[in-house]
């Protein structure tokens, strides 16, 4: 991971294939109603992990659980852009909750107009919840046919590595504990937690260094 003077990062992948891409269906647990499965497109970039991941998504949905999908697109891991688009399309159709970066929304929707892009993705894939993270500019949320902006939590950012993962961790912790919100107002505490986790993760160098513990979060509220 290389950082610029704003704490933004670029990635170089040194090991290919990595161990996680050898996941097979026999490795999957039995899923149950109420559980969550979180997936990124890196798991879809090669076999056997690709088939295993899609099988896991189908399995947990059949069991009454939900799927969270963060494309987390890393172009260096994909030799074939058509295959990337096909995998994204299939995964997005299976996801209950979708978290995109602004750049990923533009890529998937083929539009620089964020409002149009959100409407396009929502219409095509119909997720229960669509979130577009914009760093310091906050989060755009499409939920129950409504569209709202949530301000970011200001911090002194040192390293943005892992911020998206921390955001999703906070998001899923809240959704798993409390269930899907009933309306946009009820969604706000969930996104406050997610944004706090993401913001705190940027306050030290390293992907894991500043990931907050519950005690850290307790001091924020």
Curated annotation (Swiss-Prot):
Catalytic activity: D-fructose + ATP = D-fructose 6-phosphate + ADP + H(+)
GO function terms (MF aspect): ATP binding; fructokinase activity
Top-rank lineage group of the source organism: Bacteria
Keywords: ATP-binding, Carbohydrate metabolism, Kinase, Nucleotide-binding, Plasmid, Transferase
Coiled coil region boundaries: none
Enzyme class name: transferase
Name of the featured protein: Fructokinase
